[in-house]
Amino acid sequence: MPTINQLIAKGREPNKARNKVPALQGCPQKRGVCTRVYTTTPKKPNSALRKVAKVRLTNGYEVVSYIPGEGHNLQEHSVVLIRGGRVKDLPGVRYHILRGVLDTQGIAKRRQRRSLYGAKRPK
């Protein structure tokens, strides 16, 4: 425990908040190319086959990102846009792929929360 004099001389150093999405480098989104598209299983209480893609970004980072929604058209060499946002039951998945942008198609029959899934307004 420091003395009063030590605190006056040096003070306390505040804890630095760690970056949750380092690969974005402060940008809202980043572009990348899919190097592998596959499914993986979630952590303990849940059970599913979650769709994920390994993406090489324009800044050289390689990250695993989640493909949201039902069905997708992604394959190797697809160009995608990723945003931050982790998937709680998939360890190591800290990014989401944006639907309806670049090579990723939106979801056709989507009625609610359409903006998140790149779906046009139904007639």
Swiss-Prot record:
GO terms for molecular function: rRNA binding; structural constituent of ribosome; tRNA binding. GO terms for cellular component: small ribosomal subunit. Keywords: Methylation, Ribonucleoprotein, Ribosomal protein, RNA-binding, rRNA-binding, tRNA-binding. The keyword RNA-binding applies. The modification 3-methylthioaspartic acid is found at D89. One of its GO terms (biological process) is translation. It holds the Pfam family Ribosom_S12_S23. Coiled coil: none annotated. InterPro entries: NA-bd_OB-fold, Ribosomal_uS12, Ribosomal_uS12_bac. Belongs to the universal ribosomal protein uS12 family. NCBIfam families: rpsL_bact. With S4 and S5 plays an important role in translational accuracy. PANTHER family: 30S RIBOSOMAL PROTEIN S12 FAMILY MEMBER (PTHR11652). Part of the 30S ribosomal subunit. Contacts proteins S8 and S17. May interact with IF1 in the 30S initiation complex. This is Small ribosomal subunit protein uS12. The gene is rpsL.
